[in-house]
Structure formats: C-alpha cells, structure tokens
Regions:
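ABC-type ATPase nucleotide-binding domains, specifically the catalytic core motifs of the NBD
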Residues: 7-25, 33-38, 129, 147
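Conserved ABC ATPase signature
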Residues: 44-48
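ABC ATPase C-loop
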Residues: 61-62
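Conserved catalytic motifs of ABC-family nucleotide-binding domains
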Residues: 65
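Catalytic Walker B motif of ABC-type/P-loop ATPase nucleotide-binding domains
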Residues: 69-73
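Helical segment within the ABC ATPase nucleotide-binding domain
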Residues: 84-96
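A short, surface-exposed alpha-helical micro-motif characterized by mixed small hydrophobic
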Residues: 110-112
Length: 147
C-alpha cells in the first residue's frame, strides 16, 4: 500500500487483467465488497485505521485479477467486528469462484471456508484432508491445533 496515494489511486495502481477475465475486478466491485473503502476513496491510505488497511490490501490484490488469492493471516490483530467483516468478504469471494489459499489460526472460519486443509510443521505437510476428516482426527487436533 502506498500511504501517500488515496485509496482510489492505490486500487488503480495495481489494476491489471493479464488473464483476460471476462469480469475483471474494478473499483466498483472492490467498493461493493468493501463499502468502507468507497467511503474513503479520496482519503490517503496512510490515514486508514482499524481493518481498513487490510481491506485495501485485499482490494489491491484483487485488482490484479489473480487466479489464486493468497491471504496470510488476513485478520490477525484486528477487532472482532472487523475480522467478521473480512471473513464475510472472503466468503463472498469463495461464492464467486475465486480460488483462495488461506493461512490462519481461526479454525472455526477455516472449517467453514476451506474445501481442503493442510497442517504444516517446519515446512512439511503433516496432515491433509477435508474439514470432516479433521474433526474426526482428535490426535491431530490435539497435537497441532491445540483445541
């Protein structure tokens, strides 16, 4: 994010449709997904607060029209209300068919959103499967997730 550019300028700066998608991400679509950004379109990115910088970061990533959106702890350190907003947006992206790689510790959200789960330890896959298989595997949950 460029702090001396406005929200709008930050979105324009990353806009690209290299894959030639028929419905590329536009500012309007980003503003639909994150209405707060529409309210702050003319505001400098460096003055955003709460979860707004994270929303802008996701919006900027979407403006590149990625085949795979990678989100690494996208809600870490955010207030619960803002976290919920971002999870709802991720849900909407999934419903629209966006491929997403989520890295997070929030198992409740991951179970709801992920089609498939991987547990990594020191860079190696130690478990993989769907949410139902994970819920049945008490040993894995206890050892790696700590629930």
């Amino acid at each position: 994010m460029f702090p001396t550019l406005t929200v709008r300028e930050n979105l324009i700066a990353t806009a690209a449709n290299r894959a030639g998608r028929p419905q590329p991400w536009t500012q309007d679509r980003i503003y639909w997904l994150f209405p707060r950004l529409a309210e702050r379109a003319r505001q400098y990115a460096g003055t955003l607060s709460g979860g707004e910088p994270q929303m802008l970061a996701i919006g900027r990533a979407l403006m590149t029209n990625p085949k795979l959106l990678i989100l690494d702890e996208a809600t870490e350190g955010l207030a619960p209300v803002v976290r919920g907003e971002i999870w709802r947006c991720i849900e909407a992206l999934k419903a629209q068919g966006q491929s997403i790689l989520l890295i997070d510790k929030n198992m409740r959200a991951l179970k709801r959103l992920a089609d498939y789960h991987y547990i990594l330890e020191k860079g190696r896959t130690v478990w993989s499967g769907d949410a139902a298989a994970l819920e049945r595997d008490a040993t894995t949950i206890q050892r790696y997730i700590g629930i």
